[in-house]
């Protein structure tokens, strides 16, 4: 991931100077992209629940991994090769969580028992608004490159285990309750987009972009890193 981010930075630094003499002649662009977001982060939580008139504790750990990506973005020419743009992206994945809990005793007070288990298919989604400035570089009459950077607004939703019920004697885990934790945070984006035009209006292209942010989820022991390295391909529209 670090290598991909470094590549984006180098491309952003080199490409504008290498083609500074070429002016982008279109007025606006629209990009529609499908792909994947890479990355793997761990979210650990600790929550309390009531059972048998006492308080138990529930700890969980799960991986937030790679997922699918949809991106829709557009920009308008401000001056020469510079465009201002806005985009929306969605990324989502599912993962299992392992849990451990201290469960109160049904008869004796202050005699908690250890139980463990797992819960499947906890959803993680990121709806993100990207604001960016893009430097558009015509390479040939059919190929252009866009190098962009700016802030991103992440709207993050994560399923988290919050409580459980047990079967006695044992105890044996009967059901694990989950809750959706939603947070909004601001991060960054830096991207590199290549378009090959089939005619004056329509073409195909590829996107490589790095996004980053972090959120404090309910009951989480540490901040969760969101975003990551994104790659995809799709349709490219140019407006004259």
Where are these regions (language model features)?
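Cleavable N-terminal export/targeting peptides
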Residues: 1-26, 240
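Short glycine/proline- and aromatic-enriched beta-strand/turn motifs that initiate or cap beta-hairpins
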Residues: 20-78, 84, 230, 236-240
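Transmembrane beta-barrel strands of outer-membrane/channel proteins
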Residues: 32-38, 86-90, 147-155, 194, ...
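Extracellular/periplasm-exposed beta-strand and loop segments of Gram-negative cell-envelope proteins
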Residues: 39-65, 89-128, 154-185, 213-230
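Repeated loop/turn-to-beta-strand initiation elements of outer-membrane beta-barrel proteins
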Residues: 81-84, 143, 196, 200-204
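Short, structured loop/turn "capping" segments at alpha-beta junctions
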Residues: 140-146, 160
């Amino acid at each position: 991931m670090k290598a991909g981010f470094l590549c984006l930075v180098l491309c952003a630094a080199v490409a504008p100077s290498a083609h500074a003499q070429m002016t982008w002649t279109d007025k606006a662009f629209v990009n529609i992209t499908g792909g994947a977001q890479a990355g793997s982060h761990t979210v650990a939580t600790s929550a309390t629940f009531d059972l048998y008139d006492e308080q138990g504790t529930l700890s969980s750990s799960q991986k937030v991994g790679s997922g699918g990506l949809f991106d829709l973005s557009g920009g308008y020419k401000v001056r020469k090769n510079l465009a201002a743009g806005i985009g929306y992206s969605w990324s989502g994945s599912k993962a299992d969580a392992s849990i451990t809990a201290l469960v109160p005793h049904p008869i004796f007070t202050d005699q908690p028992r250890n139980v463990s288990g797992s819960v499947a298919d906890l959803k993680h989604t990121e709806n993100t608004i990207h604001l960016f400035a893009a430097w558009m570089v015509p390479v040939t009459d059919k190929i252009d490159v866009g190098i962009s950077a700016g802030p991103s607004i992440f709207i993050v939703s994560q399923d988290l285990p919050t409580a459980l019920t047990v079967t006695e004697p044992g105890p044996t885990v009967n059901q694990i309750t989950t809750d959706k934790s939603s947070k909004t945070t601001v991060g960054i984006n830096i991207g590199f987009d290549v378009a090959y035009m089939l005619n004056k209006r329509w073409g195909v292209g590829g996107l490589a972009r790095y996004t980053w942010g972090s959120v404090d989820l309910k009951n989480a022991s540490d901040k969760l890193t969101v975003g990551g390295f994104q790659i995809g391909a799709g349709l490219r529209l140019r407006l004259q």
